[in-house]
Amino acid sequence: MRDDNHFARRMRLFALAALFVLGAGGWSGVIAGTQVSFPCPPAIEPSVHFWVDVFAVYSARDFIVHDRDQVSRVYQVMHLPGSGYPGRDEAESIRAYLTQKYANILNHLATGAAPSTYEERRVAKLFQGESPSAYALAAQSLRVQQGMREQFREGLLRSRYYWPSMERTFRMFGLPPELVTLADVESGFYSRAKSGAGAVGIWQFTRTTGREHMRITRYHDDRLNPTTETEAAARLLRSNYDALGSWPLAITAYNYGTGGTEQASAEFGGDYSKIVRSYNGPHFGFASKNYYPEFLAAVEVHQNEDKYFPDMKYAETPTPPPVKTDFAPKRSARRSAHHHRHTHRARHAQRQVASAQTGHVKTGRATVMR
């Protein structure tokens, strides 16, 4: 059983290191998405900054406490000493601890009490000019994001293998080549990626959407073929753009769905900034609101790889896993058990005959001569 008191003490020991890391983000350049095709409205610039730091600055041992609705409102970045990826249980414990810690601070400030500790004063500075009720709302909007620098670097390396062929496919469909970067947002260019929601492959198609563009059966899955799935992604993105008329909306639709994005566009006159700020459609949550900013951040890092990952020039391109789209049918439990018993009896009979013919009888572990 985990000792909660010990864990809390351990977290307090990390506090000074955490405060030192806060604000160490390294992106101050021009947003890559300020081209005509991929505009970056002022409303989402802070979100793009946030995701650049997540992808290229903060490691898997950095935990960023922030506001879900205003991701640029960062309360703390806690660095976990050590090396390697934290275990799942440890990461979940840290998230729970940090969420509770800042919920307590925000709820205390919501009572109208004057900030009395260093951390309370630091949090209060983020709410200058706002009423105490803003603290209460913020307490319900806490989120902890783990850094992804190591994962993103691995994705950059894998992208070297796939990028040329993917770019050719996208150009064939009349798509801007920068859209290939979405594969990094989706899966880190990992062809065998699987999500908890059942999405599969580099482009993370669900079974339902995938069947509209690929062959997916009980024993065959084209989502595991990077070439086939890339063509499907290109067709979907082309269709999204033709239906919605802008890349911010078309890219959002890749995550949220075309129908839902069309509804949001109709409600707000196609204004992406208003949609992100005000649309309350079903399941239009954190992931969908941040999908286009994540894409712009990924483009920024890809286009400035030498700046964010200067050691990459010396790294070798990894060989991708072999493509396997066909699966042998699985026997039912009853049939498998029957087959096992039948095979076991047949082999036992064969051994008995062989033993009799050679003059040996097997009894337990010993072999006795007649």
Regions found by a protein language model. Give the residues of each.
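A generic alpha-helix surface/boundary motif
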Residues: 163-164, 183, 204, 208, ...
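Bacterial N-terminal signal peptides
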Residues: 15-25
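Alpha-helical scaffolds flanking conserved acidic
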Residues: 99, 176-183, 200, 247-252
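An acidic, Gly/Ser/Thr/Pro-rich helix-cap/linker signature
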Residues: 29-171, 339, 348-349
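Bacterial N-terminal signal peptides that target proteins for export
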Residues: 3-15
